A protein has these predicted regions:
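Interface amphipathic segments
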Residues: 1-410
Length: 410
């Protein structure tokens, strides 16, 4: 078969007819194809109905696409494949995907794809996305060179926009049973406010290098390492630079070890932990002493936390400079302890020699919370510095058998 088509038109019903005849297991017309509206093609067609080469222009209600593609299908195997070049200008991508965050897209790409029924598609992409609208901002100059396979992407993505550049190279797969991440990211002078990613940080820029090689979909499942180098934040009235931060997670004999090392914070957690069940663990222990105040949840949450933690705080400039948290720790402070769901035991012990929260200056701060026997107790000691002196505060609280006693001295 060979021919030149001055115009081949298909309505939405016509598109449905084609889908029904090309599909191995027809379950109706996909919504994304229905949104195309009326479809027309002008150009050249050659080959067979199941193996067609097309060259020309495809017009839909959402925009036009220039293409030079080979389309193949095998209905018995549920296979649909394509390869070639596609190009479009200001195509209404948001309407096609029914996503209000997206707008129009302009690209020139080489594509190779295979779709098999009941399997994730395999798509290779190489070329340039000249522009794409996201969150009311038009991103420019995105280079793609990679493969989408088994729900993940392996390759390179580079953004070279007036409001920042981002380079990604590696493999990311969040669709696998155990998510995997192995990539390098270089962020240079990204302005998140101007990119409409946040309402914060006007006139601020971020730069960093991030290398990740780990598995797991959450902190307590993570095995591997994340390394952040040269984090730089600049704004008209403030700046921050962090040389390095390393997060390493390992697992031995069924117990996790998570370590964070940086110039402002060093922390380690060892044992069995699930961060999303930690609030439930705390409430379960406290409920033992004040059951009338802390009622059991309608749907009990299983908790199996049994871990030690040790945190050393050296500098909190990152909190006040980047996150606008009005907390400053002036000297080495510590927070350590343990949780044990099986034994219903906890201990939290902290020492803060000198810190400031908003306009409050505190020295000799100490906190202790533990339940060594048949009661739970908390102690707080601190000195609140004033312009005309200082106030020493002491708080002791204890709970047992639904009774709470508190003593405050100053």
């Amino acid at each position: 078969m060979f021919g030149t088509l001055s115009e081949l038109t298909a309505t939405t019903r016509g598109v449905g007819f084609l889908v029904r005849n090309l599909s191995h297991d027809y379950n109706g017309v996909p919504p994304v194809l229905e949104r195309l509206g009326n479809v027309s093609f002008r150009g050249e067609v050659s080959g067979y109905f199941t193996d067609i080469v097309t060259y020309g222009q495809l017009h839909t209600d959402l925009g036009g696409v220039n293409m030079d593609l080979k389309l193949s299908s095998d209905k018995s195997k549920g296979l649909f494949a394509y390869s070639g070049a596609v190009k479009t200008t200001d195509y209404k991508l948001g309407k096609l995907l029914a996503n209000e965050q997206l707008g129009e897209i302009t690209f020139n790409l080489d594509v190779h794809g295979r779709h098999v029924t009941d399997r994730l598609p395999v798509v290779e992409l190489k070329g340039l996305i000249a522009s794409v609208d996201y969150s009311r901002y038009r991103y420019e100059n995105i280079t793609l060179d990679g493969e989408y396979k088994q729900g993940g992407f392996n390759g390179k993505v580079a953004l070279d926009d007036p409001n920042g550049s981002i380079y990604l190279n590696g493999d990311v797969n969040v669709a696998s049973k155990v998510p995997t991440f192995n990539f390098l990211a270089v962020v240079n002078k990204v302005r998140p406010h101007d990119l409409n990613l946040t309402t914060k940080y006007p006139d601020a820029e971020f730069s960093l290098k991030l290398k990740a090689n780990f598995t797991g979909g959450s902190v307590d499942e993570m095995i591997g390492e994340i390394n952040v180098d040269s984090l730089e934040f600049t704004a008209p009235d403030k700046a921050y630079f962090m040389q390095n931060m390393n997060i390493r997670a390992t697992k031995q004999n069924g117990e996790n070890q998570l370590r964070l090392t940086s110039e402002f914070l060093k922390a380690s957690i060892e044992g069995k932990f699930q961060y999303h069940t930690l609030p439930a663990s705390i409430l379960n222990i406290m409920r033992k002493y004040v059951p009338s105040l802390i009622l059991p949840p309608k749907k009990p949450i299983e908790t199996h936390n049994n871990f030690l933690f040790d945190i050393h705080i050296y500098n909190t400039d990152i909190l006040s400079t980047i996150f606008d948290i009005p907390l400053t720790v002036y000297t080495h402070s510590t927070l350590k302890g343990y949780f044990n769901d099986a034994l219903q035991r906890l201990r939290i012990e902290g020492y803060f020699p000198r810190l400031q929260y908003k306009n409050n200056y505190i020295e000799s701060g100490m906190i202790l919370c533990e339940n060594p026997a048949d009661h739970i107790r908390a102690r707080v000691r601190l000195t609140n510095l004033k312009k005309k002196g200082a106030v020493n505060l002491s708080l002791d609280a204890q709970a047992k058998d639904d009774n709470v006693s508190t003593t405050l001295d100053w």
